[in-house]
A protein has these predicted regions:
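Binuclear metal-dependent hydrolase catalytic cores
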Residues: 2-212, 223, 297-320
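Short, surface-exposed acidic/glycine-rich loop or hinge patches that mediate macromolecular interfaces
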Residues: 108, 137, 217, 288-289
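Cap/insert and terminal regions of metallo-dependent hydrolase folds
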Residues: 3-7, 11, 15, 210, ...
Length: 321
């Protein structure tokens, strides 16, 4: 008997079994992570999580706009776009954990996940109202969301023998300079004018670090003022072709529509200039209508005018200012 061959066969068999068991364990963890209860997540350092990075249009590769800011067990969301509950689970944050939602504006891409968040939080056992802070119109939005889901949420709770307390949002409408706090997070709003509806940018500070989430493409001067000296700036970045560029590319687009869209978004050069003048250490770009195939396609344009670190956010990315 060739013992060397037998030994090799045994080693291969053991390796194969180990590989199969490892794959099975990974598959089990992957499946169960989608429904098992999550323990509250604690952030040792002040951290921002890009839960969703899509712009207004549908994007099968990106969830709707939402950024989580956390320190310790205190978590605030900036905007609540589509699939926000799933995005929280992917980040290992229970949907019942965020204590507040800060809206940058009431554009639908920022708000359509609020009912999803509230329903998921109540299903997970939360019974304390979630704070919702935003521009004028936030209170009415909150009332509609609660009215939309209350009957179903309460009916299910009663059927399961759970606490049938109805879901609740504690809405607050704020303007320029408003200051709020959520545990270890200090929150400050700046109004962004010149847009089609009221909008805010948010500065969030914790443990001596600071981050600003802009989210809308107008009033760069106000955003620059709020972001002055910040460690990190989250903001949209989009290039809309000029009528001349569109003509050169043989695009059949109404020139007036292009001008209007350009006023709605922040161009690559502009966002870099805002960050440079404000002295921001790191610039994170999200909400791109047409995400680049390679991040370098974007960062190479912005770094012509900005000297700091540049990142293109993808769903699930985490940043520590």
């Amino acid at each position: 008997m060739n013992f060397r061959v037998v030994g090799l066969a045994i080693a291969l068999a053991v390796g194969l079994v180990s590989w199969v068991l490892t794959c099975a364990a990974w598959r089990f963890d992957h499946v169960t992570s989608g429904f098992l209860p999550l323990a509250p997540r604690a952030f040792e350092r002040f951290t921002l999580v890009a839960l969703g990075t899509a712009a207004a249009g549908e994007d099968q590769n990106r969830r709707g706009s939402a950024v989580a800011a956390g320190v310790g067990s205190d978590i605030a969301l900036v905007d609540a776009g589509r699939d926000v509950a799933e995005a929280l689970r992917a980040a290992k944050i229970p949907p019942s954990q965020p204590g507040a939602v800060l809206f940058t504006s009431l554009l639908p891409e920022n708000t359509v996940g609020l009912d999803d968040l509230l329903a998921a939080a109540w299903l997970a056992g939360r019974r304390a109202p979630i704070r919702v802070i935003g521009p004028p119109g936030t209170a009415e939005l909150a009332r509609h969301v609660v009215a939309e889901i209350t009957a179903g949420v309460v009916a299910r709770a009663r059927a399961l023998g759970d606490d049938p307390a109805p879901p609740a949002l504690d809405a607050l409408e704020v303007g320029d300079g408003a200051r709020e706090a959520l545990g270890g997070l200090a929150l400050r709003a700046a109004a962004l004018g010149d847009g089609p509806l009221p909008a805010l940018a948010w500065r969030i500070e914790a443990k001596g670090r600071s981050a600003v989430v802009g989210g809308t493409g107008w009033d760069g001067a106000a955003l620059e003022q709020l972001a002055r000296g910040a460690d990190l700036l989250f903001h949209d970045a989009n290039h809309v072709p000029s009528p001349e560029e569109a003509a050169a590319m043989s695009l059949d687009v109404d020139p007036e529509r292009l001008r209007r869209e350009a006023a709605f978004y922040t161009d690559f050069d502009e966002v870099g200039e805002i960050a440079q003048r404000a002295g921001v250490r790191t610039l994170v770009l999200y909400k791109m209508r047409q995400p680049a195939v390679l991040d370098l396609q974007v960062t190479s344009r912005v770094d012509d005018v900005y000297d700091g670190h540049i990142a293109v956010a993808h769903d699930g990315d985490e940043f520590t200012p």
